[in-house]
């Protein structure tokens, strides 16, 4: 049964170490089975590795990586006259960060490094340098939107 109203969005609290809501969302994304402590130690450990590797503030490197991962355009299926078209649409800001975090964590999990801490750190470093699987995912999404530009007039 459908809702009468939209479910309210829960406000995410900024994390205690970096005072950033984006870091909290990353921790939530990495968390499995409600083990927030484990997820937090993975994220903070990865940030320590980033700081050692670059000498820069880990939060700045992470934000740069997110900027390089977050998509601007995506395609959505739209049914017109019996056939489905992939229509390119702009991505809302909230969805941009959600997709960026999802792609970052997915790409980290598929990497070959030994621990999740290492994988996450390397993926963030790669993404900040505009390389890596998560950036490739964004490029593929943009390429798909560009290829279907002819159907942009079906936008709703």
From Swiss-Prot:
Family, as annotated: Belongs to the universal ribosomal protein uS7 family.
InterPro entries reported in the protein's UniProt record: Ribosomal_uS7 (IPR000235), Ribosomal_uS7_bac/org-type (IPR005717), Ribosomal_uS7_CS (IPR020606), Ribosomal_uS7_dom (IPR023798), Ribosomal_uS7_dom_sf (IPR036823)
CDD domains: uS7_Bacteria (cd14869)
Quaternary structure note: Part of the 30S ribosomal subunit. Contacts proteins S9 and S11.
Entry superkingdom: Bacteria
RNA-binding is among the record's keywords: yes
One Gene Ontology cellular component annotation held by this UniProt entry: small ribosomal subunit
Gene3D superfamilies: Ribosomal protein S7 domain
GO terms of molecular function: rRNA binding; structural constituent of ribosome; tRNA binding
Role played: One of the primary rRNA binding proteins, it binds directly to 16S rRNA where it nucleates assembly of the head domain of the 30S subunit. Is located at the subunit interface close to the decoding center, probably blocks exit of the E-site tRNA.
GO biological process, one term: translation
Record-given protein name: Small ribosomal subunit protein uS7
Keywords, alphabetical: Ribonucleoprotein, Ribosomal protein, RNA-binding, rRNA-binding, tRNA-binding
Organism: Streptococcus mutans serotype c (strain ATCC 700610 / UA159)
């Amino acid at each position: 049964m459908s809702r009468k109203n939209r479910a309210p969005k829960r406000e995410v609290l900024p994390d205690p170490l970096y005072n950033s809501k984006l870091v909290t969302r990353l921790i939530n994304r990495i968390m499995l089975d409600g083990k927030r402590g484990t997820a937090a130690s993975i994220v903070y450990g990865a940030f320590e590795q980033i700081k050692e590797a670059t000498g820069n503030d880990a939060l700045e490197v992470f934000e740069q990586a997110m900027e390089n991962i977050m998509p601007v355009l995506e395609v959505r299926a739209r049914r017109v006259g019996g056939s489905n078209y992939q229509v390119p649409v702009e991505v809302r800001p909230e969805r941009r960060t959600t997709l960026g975090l999802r792609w970052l964590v997915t790409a980290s999990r598929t990497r070959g490094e030994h621990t999740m801490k290492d994988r996450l750190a390397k993926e963030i470093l790669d993404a900040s340098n505009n390389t890596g699987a998560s950036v490739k995912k964004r490029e593929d999404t943009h390429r798909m939107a560009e290829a279907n530009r002819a159907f942009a007039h079906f936008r709703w």
